[in-house]
Amino acid sequence: MTAAHVAAPEPGQYELSHLRLLEAEAIHIIREVAAEFERPVLLFSGGKDSIVMLHLAIKAFAPARLPFPVMHVDTGHNFDEVIATRDRLVAENGVRLVVASVQEDIDAGRVVDNGPSRNPLQTVTLLRAIRENRFDAAFGGARRDEEKARAKERVFSFRDEFGQWDPKAQRPELWNIYNGRHRKGEHIRVFPLSNWTEYDIWAYIGAEGITLPGIYYAHTRPVFQRDGMLLAVHPYMQPRDDEEVFETSVRFRTVGDVTCTGCVESTASTVEDIIAETAVSRLTERGATRADDRISEAGMEDRKREGYF
């Protein structure tokens, strides 16, 4: 009796697309953290990367609810559209939101607001919130393509009892095996989007129909130029006497504190337009539009060593 012939599958028939492989990796990481840690939290600002991360986390546990809260480290200097999107997504998905306020730390005298940007002050607020809520793992939306300090950071990034990161003492990560071991007072930062690029993020947003704040798409806004960056006119960001204000079509590639987040001239008003624009860009979004990364060549690494995102 001869064995029945089984036809080989057509090439690519059972292969996952590039985006679905990234999605599967991120969901695996999120589930791994939920299984391994007692009190994880997802850092959620209402920006595109954290929205994608929340979308993946909801997918990871559907139809059940998200088994951990989300936390926003709030400088108080936010774009209104971003906060509105944050609150809407939290309400729609029945997620518990923890807001860690930089203003509270200023009022309590734990930090000094020397202005104009409160971005450096976020580290103190973040570490306080992690300590007070006894979080032992914190999901972040950082990607390796954004900045060179982030490029060398592990998916599971160990932080000591002071919240500090030592790039020379990182743990090996073999394939999809992650080491979350830590002692009381220490914690792990987890980056499920480490291997994604800005292009991947936008392609996934398009594929999944994810809604973002309107400032990510081209719109007309009064802006002024400072240190080679376009900054939006805002109650927390005003031009100097010698800086000319003009209106033009812009969009934001990344969103953070109003005082240090620039925009780029663009007419890309759809996901497809932005994907095409991103494909030919030669600057990362942080390199092009974040003043806080221009403090020094090692600005991001120095802040991460102190406990920054």
UniProtKB/Swiss-Prot annotation:
Source species, domain of life: Bacteria
Protein family according to the UniProt entry: Belongs to the PAPS reductase family. CysD subfamily.
UniProt xrefs under PANTHER family: SULFATE ADENYLYLTRANSFERASE SUBUNIT 2
Stated name of the protein: Sulfate adenylyltransferase subunit 2
Keyword 4Fe-4S: no
One of the GO BP terms on file: hydrogen sulfide biosynthetic process
Entry keyword annotation includes Ligase: no
Enzyme Commission number(s) from the entry: 2.7.7.4
Enzyme class: transferase
Annotated metabolic or biological route of this protein: Sulfur metabolism; hydrogen sulfide biosynthesis; sulfite from sulfate: step 1/3
Function in brief: With CysN forms the ATP sulfurylase (ATPS) that catalyzes the adenylation of sulfate producing adenosine 5'-phosphosulfate (APS) and diphosphate, the first enzymatic step in sulfur assimilation pathway. APS synthesis involves the formation of a high-energy phosphoric-sulfuric acid anhydride bond driven by GTP hydrolysis by CysN coupled to ATP hydrolysis by CysD.
InterPro entries registered for this protein in UniProt: PAPS_reduct_dom (IPR002500), Rossmann-like_a/b/a_fold (IPR014729), SO4_adenylTrfase_ssu (IPR011784), Sulfate_adenylyltrnsfr_sub2 (IPR050128)
Complexes and interactors: Heterodimer composed of CysD, the smaller subunit, and CysN.
Catalytic activity line of the entry: sulfate + ATP + H(+) = adenosine 5'-phosphosulfate + diphosphate
GO molecular function, one term: sulfate adenylyltransferase (ATP) activity
Entry keywords, A to Z: ATP-binding, Nucleotide-binding, Nucleotidyltransferase, Transferase
